[in-house]
Amino acid sequence: MIIRFKINEIECEVNEEKEDITILQACTANGIEIPRFCYHEKLTIAGNCRMCLVYVTNEEKLLAACGIPLDENFDDESIETEIDEILKAREGVMEFLLINHPLDCPICDQGGECDLQEQTLAYGLDTGRFYIKKRAVEIKTFGRLIKGIMTRCIHCTRCVRFLTEIAGVNELGVLGRGYNMEIGTYKKNVMIESELSGNIIDLCPVGALTSAVYAYKGRPWELKNIKGIDIFDTLLTPINYQVKGGEIFRILPRINDRINEEWITDKVRFHYESYKIIEKIRKETPSYKIQANKFIELTWKTALKMVFKVLLNKKNKVDLIIGSKINSTNLRIYKELMNRLGSKNYITENGLMFKKFNYDLRENYINSNDLYNVDKNDLVLLCGINLRVESPLLNIKLRNVNFGDDEIESVKKIGIIGNKFDWKHESEYIGATLNSMLKLFEGRLPYCQQIKKSKAPLIIVGPSLLTRISLTLQEMRAIFMKACNLKPENILIITQGANFGMALEEGLFKEKFSIGGNVLYSIDSNEVQVTNKINYVIYQGIINDKFENKIDLYLPSKHYFEDFEGDREVYMNTFGQRSEIEKLSISKGNKIKENSMIGYIQLMYLNNKEMTRKEKEQKDIKLSYREMKKEEKRKIKVNKYLTINNIIENYYMTDINIRLSKNLMITGQLRKEKKIMEAGIWKNRKCI
Amino acid sequence: MFRSLLKRTTFLNQLNKSNGFNRNYFKQSTLTRSDALSRHVETEDNNEHTPFDFTQENLVKVEKILAKYPKQYRQSALIPLLDLAQRQNGGWISLRAMDKVAHICGIAPMTAYEVASFYTMFNRTKIGENFVQVCTTTPCMLRGSGEIIKTCKSHLGIQVGETTPDNKFTLVEVECLGACVNAPMMCINDDFYEDLTSASTINLLDQIKNNKPTKIGPQTHRKAAEGPQGKTTLLEPPVGPTCRDDL
Ligand code: SF4
Ligand code: FES
Ligand code: FES
């Protein structure tokens, strides 16, 4: 049935069968703004703030627009949002909200982006009438990252809904009632144990939940937005750096419905602390080690000469390892450099995990799935991946998978091979060893039948499985497709590192690579094991904490977001989606050079010619799987009883930037020890 | 100069007082009610390590309660189970007891905390053996509940919200308990005592203190809620059904 109605004299119609929308959504679609506090697009409807009241003809009372679906009752009715009655009602609601709200806007971090402030200005009464006692609630601690000044809370319950529905942790709740109602953890000093807890800071419409790291640092109107990406995750979530005067003040998500919706992980939200520390402790000039712990400073000219002395020495065997944040321009330059030197020993640090890889076809390293409709799947099998830690954003997408009505029955729609971890739905735990994986390949498990039966299964293969089995990705895919009757879209392969896909795009991979040479040239790569065989280490990057004392020649280079020629650079995620990043400069030292600049100089030195930039043709190549099937016949040789453990032990330790962010580190440690936070942690933070 | 400043502040104070408000006065949530604080208070007898488990006979009751609800909605048993736990625990419900109930219902502990803190009849801090709840809502107040509360305070030697040192009594004020016809009234544990006077209150408290039997219901000669002329309506016996038999 088509419903025709009017909103403020605008004629609208809604097809009831096709669209299922509320009054508020219809108003927004027609460009009419309705003030709100508790309603949020991505959360369930609570309807407890009453700010969204509208007038509907033939209704006795005003209706809360956020919670009322448009159905046949609205046919021929008209909805009014600007009449006096509504304005009066809004004033009333605002007045009630402000009774107990403290007047500390000048010292509140939300000031300037506070919904309550803005809406008071737009819809509130111009004078207050309450001179009675104000209620106060004690300050609560939710960990090192989130500051909870709960007197400011207006009880919209967005934070509670986010944590229970989306993040899947039940650590916040609505306690007490009436005058005594509080949002809190009930027990004292409970840390919110979610990788996505930082999002409640963005969700909170007032300053009750604010970032502890950003506390008293800046005001939103002085900050400039610069586009960036979440470099710690293969999804490459779009983010915004908020900067002022060459310093990152905070990081906020950029909305993208295909990737992150509105959320970002805590890791990227709070890691910017480290840049400041890095700025303080890094070396700003090229330097050379003469003794243990004793460096002399060099000029760039001599430093580069020394590099060439090493690289061009015929006796040396050079391995080039590139870090996971380097962009594709640099990947191309350094590959070219190594090629000119006649060597093929180059790889990215994440590529090191894989023994074999066929990067001829794009299908082999890029997933053809679309995250947008990931929740349409009706069965999920996780192989060797702890989604919560390895890809928290994908995890929350999958947590909302609609399992239909049989969710209640005992059919378990989630299978896990590898380490156990908590999920919303009950899951079937298949096994931790490779043996169960092999059984699955051969179709011997009862679970295979379930996979075959389901309409849209999704199999997620994690890096820990890929590294323990001597199969290439495409072989794995082919086996799966054969064993369980699947299509390529049903398999999702999660790798690690931001530039893994891009490196393969540039052909920067070598099969069976092992660090065997005596010279290691590391470009911003920390996660490499430096053996005793290596007698010369060139480290070109920012800061190193893994093999710092083994570095012989240090070349300071810039961060990944400072290091490209134009204003923008494009990164590609594991789904082949591209995210743009903009240039941001925070490095102060003028002797710090871009990786690309160093690379070009080296190339020019090599043959005094401009490098011709070869771009690999970026067409979508669709090829049949015939070739792969040939390879499939090879036997799989593995130790059957190897367990598929997680690659990432501690979520808060995976990258140098994270290891250097104090608050993230402490959060990680606290969580590791499962320790309840000590009281008084705020006192040493000089926050309040 | 200091003196003039002092004068000025006292003047301001007086002004505030005479206007009947004080602008800068912030207040913590009230402590005196049975709903107490909206959070857990760590004490010796109620902390993370205080053990709680249902007794054998109560476990049978738990099964019975769970059987009333469809299997997939077993969280509906939350309130009856919390009540059972509270009874077993001596009138109050500890942190671990809530965790236990939540576990039985298959929900997060937080949900149990939310429910227990919402309903004022769940006590989340330790109370005395006898929980004296004096009604102070309008009908009772008009019939003299102020006097009753005063008597309780002076006789037990405690304030509202406190427990006697011998752990016998806890005194609280409550809202209407639905016995307004026989106001003023109070409720001690599960029993109602109505038509109170100061004397009968003292008498009652003494009897309870010495573990003597008490008269439940009106403390005067009134029978149930009859008026002064006795029963005038509903003279014939009630027709059934009277109550659900599964309750
Ligand atoms: S803390 Fe913020 S998000 Fe949570 S209920 Fe209060 S106002 Fe809403
Ligand atoms: S937005 Fe509708 S009630 Fe809060
Ligand atoms: S007012 Fe006291 S019982 Fe109703």
From Swiss-Prot, chain A:
Catalytic reactions of this protein: a ubiquinone + NADH + 5 H(+)(in) = a ubiquinol + NAD(+) + 4 H(+)(out)
Record-annotated 4Fe-4S Mo/W bis-MGD-type domain positions: 223-279
Cofactor annotation: [2Fe-2S] cluster; [4Fe-4S] cluster
One Pfam family matching this protein: Molybdopterin
InterPro entries given in the database record: 2Fe-2S_ferredoxin-like_sf, 2Fe-2S_ferredoxin-type, Mopterin_OxRdtase, Mopterin_OxRdtase_4Fe-4S_dom, NADH_UbQ_OxRdtase_75kDa_su_CS, NADH_UbQ_OxRdtase_ferredoxin, NADH_UbQ_OxRdtase_Gsu, NADH_UbQ_OxRdtase_Gsu_4Fe4S-bd
Residue ranges that the Swiss-Prot or TrEMBL entry lists as coiled coil: none
Signal peptide: none
Domain 2Fe-2S ferredoxin-type: 1-85
CDD domains: fer2, MopB_Res-Cmplx1_Nad11-M
Chief place where the protein resides: mitochondrion
Binding site for [2Fe-2S] cluster: 38, 49, 52, 66
Oxidoreductase is among the record's keywords: yes
Span of domain 4Fe-4S His(Cys)3-ligated-type: 85-124
GO molecular function, one term: NADH dehydrogenase (ubiquinone) activity
Binding site for [4Fe-4S] cluster 1: 101, 105, 108, 114
Enzyme class: translocase
Cellular compartments annotated: Mitochondrion inner membrane
Residues reported to bind [4Fe-4S] cluster 2: 153, 156, 159, 204
Matching SMART domains: NADH-G_4Fe-4S_3
EC number assigned by the record: 7.1.1.2
One term under GO cellular component: mitochondrial inner membrane
Quaternary structure, from the entry: Complex I is composed of about 45 different subunits.
Family affiliation: Belongs to the complex I 75 kDa subunit family.
Protein name: NADH-ubiquinone oxidoreductase 75 kDa subunit
Organism encoding this protein: Dictyostelium discoideum (Social amoeba)
Curated annotation (Swiss-Prot), chain B:
Subcellular location: Mitochondrion inner membrane
Transit peptide boundaries: 1-40
GO biological-process terms attached to the record: mitochondrial electron transport, NADH to ubiquinone
Gene Ontology MF term list: 2 iron, 2 sulfur cluster binding; metal ion binding; NADH dehydrogenase (ubiquinone) activity
Domain of life of the native organism: Eukaryota
Keywords, alphabetical: 2Fe-2S, Electron transport, Iron, Iron-sulfur, Membrane, Metal-binding, Mitochondrion, Mitochondrion inner membrane, NAD, Oxidoreductase, Respiratory chain, Transit peptide, Translocase, Transport, Ubiquinone
GO cellular component: mitochondrial inner membrane; respiratory chain complex I
E.C. number: 7.1.1.2
Pfam families, per the entry: 2Fe-2S_thioredx
Needed co-factor(s): [2Fe-2S] cluster
Primary site of residence: mitochondrion
Record flagged with keyword Metal-binding: yes
Residues involved in [2Fe-2S] cluster binding: 135, 140, 176, 180
Gene3D superfamilies in the record: Glutaredoxin, NADH-quinone oxidoreductase subunit E
UniProt-annotated stretches for the region Disordered: 211-247
Catalytic activity reported: a ubiquinone + NADH + 5 H(+)(in) = a ubiquinol + NAD(+) + 4 H(+)(out)
Free-text remark on how the cofactor is bound: Binds 1 [2Fe-2S] cluster.
Family: Belongs to the complex I 24 kDa subunit family.
Function: Core subunit of the mitochondrial membrane respiratory chain NADH dehydrogenase (Complex I) that is believed to belong to the minimal assembly required for catalysis. Complex I functions in the transfer of electrons from NADH to the respiratory chain. The immediate electron acceptor for the enzyme is believed to be ubiquinone.
Subunit and partners: Complex I is composed of 45 different subunits. This is a component of the flavoprotein-sulfur (FP) fragment of the enzyme.
Record NCBIfam families: nuoE_fam, PRK07539.1-5
Protein name (record): NADH dehydrogenase [ubiquinone] flavoprotein 2, mitochondrial
Native organism: Dictyostelium discoideum
Gene (UniProt): ndufv2
